[in-house]
From Swiss-Prot:
Coiled coil ranges: none
Gene: PB2
Assembly and interaction partners: Influenza RNA polymerase is composed of three subunits: PB1, PB2 and PA. Interacts (via N-terminus) with PB1 (via C-terminus). Interacts with nucleoprotein NP (via N-terminus).
Function: Plays an essential role in transcription initiation and cap-stealing mechanism, in which cellular capped pre-mRNAs are used to generate primers for viral transcription. Recognizes and binds the 7-methylguanosine-containing cap of the target pre-RNA which is subsequently cleaved after 10-13 nucleotides by the viral protein PA. Plays a role in the initiation of the viral genome replication and modulates the activity of the ribonucleoprotein (RNP) complex.
Primary location group: virion
SUPFAM superfamilies the UniProt entry points to: PB2 C-terminal domain-like
Protein name: Polymerase basic protein 2
Length: 759
C-alpha cells in the first residue's frame, strides 16, 4: 500500500509525467530487448501505431491493377511509394473496405468443406442448450484435455503425409500412406477439394485441425470431452458455472468412450481365461470399434485409462509412468523408496505378506471425483490433503490413501477374514484385499485412526471420522482443501512389461497396473463394438454363446469335419468351445463329454454311421475333460433363459432344431445357418439305422428274403428279422429289438458283429 501511495504522489507531479512521456529511451538493454529477434515484443502497441499510419499494409504490385487508386470518396487506397526494402506497394486499410464491397467474388462451394470444423462447431452451439448460471466455488483441476472436436486420430507424421498428398501433391518428397485411415481420408479429401481456390496454406491448417488430436493442460471442473472443452470459457469461471448440453456429439469423443468400454470388457474376460495375456491379445486383434480395428485405435489414441493402458502394454506400446491403485492415478512427485517383504498381523490375527515401501515419498492422487496430495514415510501417513466433489468422493480418496500408507492401525482395523477373489476365483494380493475390505466398510478404520486439533489455515478444514467437516479437529494428518490437485501434465511415455496375468510393470519392476484396477462400471458404447473373438460371445448372455457356438461350427464345417475324423483331440481343445462350457451344469460336464466322445468314436469305427446333424449338435459337449462312465443320456441339459433346457441326443428340441426340408438349423429360434450333409448320408446311412434299435445276428441268411434297403427296414415289427445291405455292399442279418435299447450298447455290439459277420 505504501508503494502505491508513493507512486500516486509521484504521478501527481507534472515533472514525473513529463519524464515518462517525453524522454527518449536510450538505455542499450531496453533497446536490445525491443529490437532483437523477429518476435514482436509488444504486439498491441505495434498494432496501434501501425494503424495510425496512413499505409500500414504492404501488398503485391498486382494490387495496382485490381484496385483503383482512389475510392468513390476520393480517398487514396494505395501509395505509389514502394515499401522500404521490398518491391511491394504500401496500402491503406480503406483498400480492404473497397475490396469487401466491390472486389471479385469466388465460388463458396469449398468453404464448408475446408472450414468443416468451424461449421460443425456453429451447428453444435446452435443446437446446444445453455442452462442457468450457478454461483459457487469451483474446484478446478488441470487435466490434459482434447481441444478440437471432430478430429481423426492420426499421428502428426501421418497427418503431415496426408496433408502433403492432398494439398501439395506435386511437391517433391517421399510420402508413405500406409494405414487404412490415411488412405481413406486422402481419397475423400482429394475428391472434396477438387478445383479449390482457397489458399493451400489455409487448407493445410484446416486439415491439420481435422486430422490431429490437439491437447492442452487446462483447469476443468466438469465434463472433459472435447465438445465441453470448446465452450469452457462459457461454462465455468472462478466462482460460477453455467449448465450446458452440447448440441451434437463428435466421433473422437465417441471413440474414446467406446474404446474404454471395449478395453474393460476385454480385460475382464481375459482375466478368467486359462492364458489371460494370449486371450487379451487375441481379443484386441479381432475387435472393431465403429468399423476400425481396435489395435489401430490403441496405437493412435492417447486416452489414459487402466484397461486401455493394459491393452496398450500387451501390444508393446509405451504408457504413462504413473501407477494406479484403488481407481486413483498416483504420481510420485518427490522422494524415493525401496521395497521389502514384511509379514503383518491383521486385527483378526491373519498373517499378510505385504511389500513395504521404505522411505519418504510424496504423491499426487487423481481420481474422477476427488484428488489429493499424499506425504508418507515407511508405513506412516504424514499428511493427506484431499479435495473432492462430495463427502462420498472424499471418503473414497481417504480410504485409498490410508491403505496405501500401510500404517499398522489400518491393518489392525481389519475385522473378520480377508478372502476376496478376482473374477477367475484367485485370491487378490494383500494390498487389494485390504482395499476391498475397507471399501466395503471403513467405520472401524476411521474410528481407530485417531484425531488431532488443527490450526486455522486458509482454504483448509478438518474432517471427522464420520466424514463431517470441522474447523477444530480432524483425522490425524488429514485435511480437506478447497483447491483441487492438478493431474500429472507430462505426456512422457515409458517402456513397460506385462506378465501373463496382465500385471504391468515399469523397468524397475514396480507394478503400475493390474486387472484389479480395472473399473467394474458398466456403460453403453456410443459406437458399435464388434467382438469377433469367441471369448466375447458371453458378453450378450448365454443365448448368444449357444447361437454363436453352433454358427461357428457350421461356418467352419469343412475343417471341423476333417478334424473330427482325423484329430478329434485337437478339435475338442478348440477355444471356441470354451464359452459353451459355462452353460453346461458343472456336475454333468465330464459325464456328457465322456458319453459324446464314446458315441463319436463309434461313428468313426462303424462305416456309414456319420451323421452331420448329430455331430454338430453334440460336438460342444465333447470339449470338457471327459469322465469314463457307463452313463447313457437321451438328452443333455444347457442353462439358458434362467433354467435348464434340453437338447435331445436324437431329434429336435426348441434349443436345437434342424429342418430337413430347408436344411437350416435354428438355435433357440434364431437362424444359425445352413447345413451341408454328406451326399451319402440320406441313403447309405444303413449302419446308423442298424445302430438304432437293431441287433446284428450274423451273415446274410437267404431264408429271410432279399436284402432290404434302409427305408424298408423301418417297416419291420419288433423281433422281426431281415437281411440288410450295409455300407460297402455287404449284407448282414439283423433283428429289430423287442425293446428300445440304449444307443451305446447297440452301437458297441453292432460294431463288433458287423466286423465278425463280414469277415
Amino acid at each position: 500500500m505504501e508503494r502505491i501511495k508513493e507512486l500516486r504522489d509521484l504521478m501527481s507531479q507534472s515533472r514525473t509525467r513529463e519524464i515518462l512521456t517525453k524522454t527518449t529511451v536510450d538505455h542499450m538493454a531496453i533497446i536490445k530487448k525491443y529490437t532483437s529477434g523477429r518476435q514482436e515484443k509488444n504486439p498491441a502497441l505495434r498494432m496501434k501505431w501501425m494503424m495510425a499510419m496512413k499505409y500500414p499494409i504492404t501488398a503485391d504490385k498486382r494490387i495496382m491493377e485490381m484496385i483503383p487508386e482512389r475510392n468513390e470518396q476520393g480517398q487514396t487506397l494505395w501509395s505509389k511509394t514502394n515499401d522500404a526494402g521490398s518491391d511491394r506497394v504500401m496500402v491503406s486499410p480503406l483498400a480492404i473496405t473497397w475490396w469487401n464491397r466491390n472486389g471479385q467474388t469466388t465460388s463458396t462451394v469449398h468453404y464448408p468443406k475446408v472450414y468443416k470444423t468451424y461449421f460443425e462447431k456453429v451447428e453444435r452451439l446452435k443446437h446446444g442448450t445453455f442452462g442457468p448460471v450457478h454461483f459457487r466455488n469451483q474446484v478446478k483441476i488441470r487435466r490434459r484435455v482434447d481441444i478440437n472436436p471432430g478430429h481423426a486420430d492420426l499421428s502428426a507424421k501421418e497427418a503431415q503425409d496426408v496433408i502433403m498428398e492432398v494439398v501439395f501433391p506435386n511437391e517433391v518428397g517421399a510420402r508413405i500412406l500406409t494405414s487404412e485411415s490415411q488412405l481413406t481420408i486422402t481419397k475423400e479429401k482429394k475428391e472434396e477439394l477438387q478445383d479449390c481456390k482457397i489458399a493451400p496454406l489455409m487448407v493445410a491448417y484446416m486439415l491439420e485441425r481435422e486430422l490431429v488430436r490437439k491437447t492442452r493442460f487446462l483447469p476443468v471442473a466438469g465434463g472433459t470431452s472435447s465438445v465441453y472443452i470448446e465452450v469452457l470459457h462459457l461454462t465455468q469461471g472462478t466462482c460460477w458455472e453455467q449448465m450446458y448440453t452440447p448440441g451434437g456429439e463428435v466421433r473422437n469423443d465417441d471413440v474414446d468412450q467406446s474404446l474404454i468400454i471395449a478395453a474393460r470388457n476385454i480385460v475382464r474376460r481375459a482375466t478368467v481365461s486359462a492364458d489371460p495375456l494370449a486371450s487379451l491379445l487375441e481379443m484386441c486383434h479381432s475387435t472393431q470399434i465403429g468399423g476400425i480395428r481396435m489395435v489401430d485405435i490403441l496405437r493412435q489414441n492417447p486416452t489414459e485409462e487402466q484397461a486401455v493402458d493394459i491393452c496398450k502394454a500387451a501390444m508393446g506400446l509405451r504408457i504413462s509412468s504413473s501407477f494406479s491403485f484403488g481407481g486413483f492415478t498416483f504420481k510420485r512427485t518427490s522422494g524415493s523408496s525401496v521395497k521389502r517383504e514384511e509379514e503383518v498381523l491383521t486385527g483378526n490375527l491373519q498373517t499378510l505378506k505385504i511389500r513395504v515401501h521404505e522411505g519418504y515419498e510424496e504423491f499426487t492422487m487423481v481420481g474422477r471425483r476427488a484428488t489429493a496430495i499424499l506425504r508418507k514415510a515407511t508405513r506412516r501417513l504424514i499428511q493427506l490433503i484431499v479435495s473432492g466433489r462430495d463427502e462420498q468422493s472424499i471418503a473414497e480418496a481417504i480410504i485409498v490413501a490410508m491403505v496405501f500408507s500401510q500404517e499398522d492401525c489400518m491393518i489392525k482395523a481389519v475385522r473378520g477374514d480377508l478372502n476376496f477373489v478376482n473374477r477367475a476365483n484367485q485370491r487378490l494380493n494383500p494390498m487389494h484385499q485390504l482395499l476391498r475390505h475397507f471399501q466395503k466398510d471403513a467405520k472401524v478404520l476411521f474410528q481407530n485412526w485417531g484425531i488431532e486439533p488443527i490450526d486455522n489455515v486458509m482454504g483448509m478444514i478438518g474432517i471427522l471420522p464420520d466424514m463431517t467437516p470441522s474447523t477444530g479437529m480432524s483425522l490425524r494428518g488429514v485435511r480437506v482443501s478447497k483447491m483441487g490437485v492438478d493431474e500429472y501434465s507430462s505426456t512422457e511415455r515409458v517402456v513397460v512389461s506385462i506378465d501373463r496375468f496382465l500385471r504391468v510393470r515399469d523397468q524397475r519392476g514396480n507394478v503400475l497396473l493390474s486387472p484389479e484396477e480395472v473399473s467394474e462400471a458398466q456403460g453403453t458404447e456410443k459406437l458399435t463394438i464388434t467382438y469377433s473373438s469367441s471369448m466375447m460371445w458371453e458378453i450378450n448372455g448365454p443365448e448368444s454363446v449357444l447361437v454363436n457356438t453352433y454358427q461357428w461350427i457350421i461356418r467352419n464345417w469343412e475343417t471341423v469335419k476333417i478334424q473330427w475324423s482325423q484329430d478329434p483331440t485337437m478339435l475338442y481343445n478348440k477355444m471356441e468351445f470354451e464359452p459353451f462350457q459355462s452353460l453346461v451344469p458343472k456336475a454333468a460336464r465330464g459325464q456328457y463329454s465322456g458319453f459324446v466322445r464314446t458315441l463319436f468314436q463309434q461313428m468313426r469305427d462303424v462305416l456309414g454311421t456319420f451323421d452331420t446333424v448329430q455331430i454338430i449338435k453334440l460336438l460342444p459337449f465333447a470339449a470338457a475333460p471327459p469322465e469314463q462312465s457307463r452313463m447313457q443320456f437321451s438328452s443333455l441339459t444347457v442353462n439358458v433363459r434362467g433354467s435348464g433346457m434340453r437338447i435331445l441326443v436324437r431329434g429336435n428340441s426348441p434349443v436345437f432344431n434342424y429342418n430337413k426340408a430347408t436344411k437350416r438349423l435354428t438355435v433357440l429360434g434364431k437362424d444359425a445357418g445352413a447345413l451341408i450333409e454328406d451326399p451319402d448320408e440320406g441313403t447309405a446311412g444303413v449302419e446308423s439305422a442298424v445302430l438304432r434299435g437293431f441287433l446284428i445276428l450274423g451273415k446274410e441268411d437267404k431264408r429271410y428274403g432279399p436284402a432290404l434297403s434302409i427305408n424298408e427296414l423301418s417297416n419291420l415289427a419288433k423281433g422281426e428279422k431281415a437281411n440288410v445291405l450295409i455300407g460297402q455292399g455287404d449284407v448282414v442279418l439283423v433283428m429289430k429289438r423287442k425293446r428300445d435299447s440304449s444307443i451305446l450298447t447297440d452301437s458297441q455290439t453292432a460294431t463288433k458283429r458287423i466286423r465278425m459277420a463280414i469277415n
